[in-house]
């Protein structure tokens, strides 16, 4: 197993853990509002789909999608605890241990995905081959 394969496996694990936690909290968040509950359903479905897609074929598109979902979840939680989410949950959410654990898992997933995304190589035109006149 290569280091890249291990990183993909950990990203799959982070997607699965986060999907499980979001799925377990759906009912509780539907009690707070339909929009908030629906958001947790969407997060669960997206994370589960990413875990499956990464297991089957971890393409750059799937990795970029995982990065987007993780970043979105982290940003939405930051908004939820600082200002609230307009329309969905205008009151500020209280910070709790499970939420912090989930966000730590998602941050690990995001950091690992960032290392797996390919960056285009920059052409280096100013270098000359060894032994050629300058």
Residue spans for each PLM region:
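Membrane-interface extramembranous regions
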Residues: 1-134
């Amino acid at each position: 197993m290569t280091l890249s394969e291990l990183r993909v496996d950990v990203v799959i694990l982070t997607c699965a853990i986060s999907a499980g936690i979001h799925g377990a909290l759906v009912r509780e968040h539907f009690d707070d509002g339909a929009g908030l509950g629906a958001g947790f359903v969407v997060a669960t479905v997206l994370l589960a789909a990413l875990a499956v897609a990464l297991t089957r074929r971890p393409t750059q598109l799937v990795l970029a999608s995982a990065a987007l979902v993780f970043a979105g979840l982290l940003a939405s939680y930051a908004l939820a605890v600082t200002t609230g989410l307009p329309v969905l949950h205008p009151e500020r959410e209280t910070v709790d241990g499970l939420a912090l654990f989930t966000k730590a898992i998602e941050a690990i997933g995001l950091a690992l995905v960032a290392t797996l995304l390919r960056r285009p190589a920059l052409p280096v035109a100013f270098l000359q081959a060894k032994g050629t006149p300058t």
